[in-house]
Every structure is written in C-alpha cells, then in structure tokens.
Swiss-Prot record:
Its EC number is 5.1.1.8. It is an enzyme of class 5 (isomerase). It catalyses: trans-4-hydroxy-L-proline = cis-4-hydroxy-D-proline. GO terms for molecular function: 4-hydroxyproline epimerase activity. Belongs to the proline racemase family. It comes from Xanthomonas campestris pv. campestris (strain ATCC 33913 / DSM 3586 / NCPPB 528 / LMG 568 / P 25). Keywords: Isomerase. This is 4-hydroxyproline 2-epimerase. Substrate binds at residues 89-90, 208, 234, 239-240. PANTHER family: TRANS-3-HYDROXY-L-PROLINE DEHYDRATASE. SUPFAM superfamilies: Diaminopimelate epimerase-like (SSF54506).
Length: 312
C-alpha cells in the first residue's frame, strides 16, 4: 500500500493538491529535467493523484521538491489530469497558502522555483498572495482561424507561463450558466488551431483558450472564460491567463505600467493584476486568495483496478 500526503486548497474556486510526501525520487538535475523524468517514468503517479477516483478534471497537482535555486523556498512541478504545466498561477497561490499553513513560511517576500523559472511571491498578513510571474509576452497579434460552426475567430497568441489563444469573440454571455456552450466553443477553437498548425513560439502547443470580455456586474472589471488542457474550464480567473492578457493589453497600449487590472473568472471571483516592463514583454504581478480545504493521505492499493486513476 502506497501512501501520499497531500493538502488540498482552492484559489478563487479552482483546486490545488500539494504533494508533501510519498512520491518517488526524481533524481538530480534542474526542475525541467525532473519534470521530464516525472513524465517518462512516473506518469501513473500523476494520474493517481489528479484523475478520478481521487481527483477530477479540474484538479491541479503541485509536487514540492527541494529547490535548485538557493534563493527559493521550494521547488514545484505542476500537473493535471492530462499532463504537465510549466507554471500555474492559481496553483502557486495555493502552494504559498499551504506553506503558510505548514509554518514553513511567514508573511513577507519569498521565491518559488518552477520548471520555467523562479517566481517571486509575497504573502500579506491578511492572507493575500501576490505572484511576480515569469516574463510574459504576446507572440502574435490578430491571428485568424476558421472554426467549424463559428466562422473566422480572431485572437492573440500569448505566453503567460503557458500558451494561450485569447479572443474577445464570445458566442454567449460569460456566465456559469453558459459554461457548456463556452466549453464547446473554446474546444472547437483549440481543435481548429491544431488543424491549422498554429502554435506558440518554437512550436509550443496552445493548450489554453481564453475568452475575454467585460464583467456583467457593472464593476468595470474584466471577465474571462478559460479552457484548460484537460478540457475543463478554469473556475478561477487563471493566473497565467491573466498574465498573458496583461501582456496583450500592454502591447496594445491599453494598460499602463503599474495600472491595476481586475480580472474576474467565470464564477465572479477575481484576481488583481498589474505589470512592469521587462525584456521582450512584461513582468506581471497577480494577487488573490486561497483557502485550505483538506489534509489527507491518498492510499494506493495494488489490488485496486483504479489504483493509478481512471484514464481515458
């Protein structure tokens, strides 16, 4: 019987499962190399943690590892029900909240190492977590793709720690009641991008689709709908998606450096974003809250036919 110690949380409605102990040794090397060993040798552990019956299509796992960067308080590899993430904004907020729950960090400035770079984080006394995300940028503007049943859809391809196609063309209101229609629409966009050979830089797969609009509550905030790689919609405003959106706004001159941007997700929960100029794009800062929902041990019984998860 294998046991895996985890702490679960949610960030603006989106779950994170932090893996504390019980995972196989991924060896030496940087975190990108560890992620590749995770993928090649231990992918069944990913599905055991993130997939049903223990997880779900919304679950993001966060495996804590000793950092290679001496300035970081921890290393982390993010994963979900279908694969691996370079960075995860809501997941990082969940990791910081979990580290605080464990007494491993106090309010103040910290750094967390990911496979795509080390990010700065700040934990405030009231529990607000702010992330200085990886450098984000717009790769291509005004990209058009023919989407069966919807015609030509225009959007930007941007990096915020993952690759996004961001469009303002929505088939309906951006509300929870419309999530099925929005999911079908964004999945159709993703398939059309793949069929057309449209990618991020160096052939990077565009595995997140984001619809951007105005919040319906009259607050002046923005609202988005984000389709994640496993074809589940993001319950949160999506930290990497908000970073990618900020990069596009900055490139278009629609948001000034340091100006506050309030980004709602499909549930109406919000992240606050801002940026400073950096290199080829921007250095985004995303702020939000996470809440602990469970401390538990996952049990993997070799006799269980679904010990390593239900995988399509």
């Amino acid at each position: 019987m294998h046991t895996i110690d985890v702490i679960d949380s949610h960030t603006a409605g989106e779950p994170t499962r932090v893996v504390l102990a019980g995972f196989p040794d991924l060896g030496d090397g940087d975190l990108a190399q560890c992620r590749e060993r995770f993928r090649s040798d231990f992918d069944h552990w990913r599905s055991a943690i993130a997939c049903e019956p223990r997880g779900s299509d919304t679950m993001v796992g966060a495996l804590l590892l000793p950092p290679r960067d001496p300035s970081a308080c921890t290393g982390v590899i993010f994963f979900n029900n279908v694969g691996y993430l370079g960075m995860c904004g809501h997941g990082t907020i969940g990791v910081v909240r979990t580290l605080a729950e464990l007494g491993r960090i106090a309010p103040g400035q910290h750094r967390i190492e990911t496979p795509v770079g080390t990010v700065g984080v700040a934990l405030a006394d009231d529990g607000t977590v702010s992330i200085d995300n990886v450098e984000s940028y717009r790769h291509a503007a005004g990209v058009e793709v023919d989407v069966p049943g919807h015609g030509r859809v225009r959007g930007d391809v941007a990096w915020g720690g993952n690759w996004f196609f961001i469009t303002e063309q929505a088939p309906c209101a951006l509300g929870l009641a419309q999530q099925r229609e929005l999911t079908a629409y964004t999945e159709a966009i993703r398939l059309a991008l793949e069929a057309a050979g449209i990618t991020g830089e160096a052939g990077g797969e565009i595995d997140h689709i984001e619809i951007s609009g105005v919040a319906p509550d009259g607050s002046g905030a923005a609202r988005n709908f984000v389709l994640c790689p496993g074809l589940a919609y993001d319950r949160s405003p999506c930290g990497t998606g908000t970073s990618a959106k900020l990069a596009c706004l900055a490139a278009d001159g629609k948001l000034a450096e340091g100006e506050r941007w309030l980004q709602q997700g499909i549930l109406g929960s919000a992240f606050e974003g801002s940026y400073r100029h950096s290199g080829r794009g921007i250095a985004p800062r995303i702020s939000g809250h996470a809440f602990i929902t469970a401390r538990s041990q996952l049990l993997i019984d070799p006799a269980d036919p679904f010990a390593w998860g239900i995988v399509a």
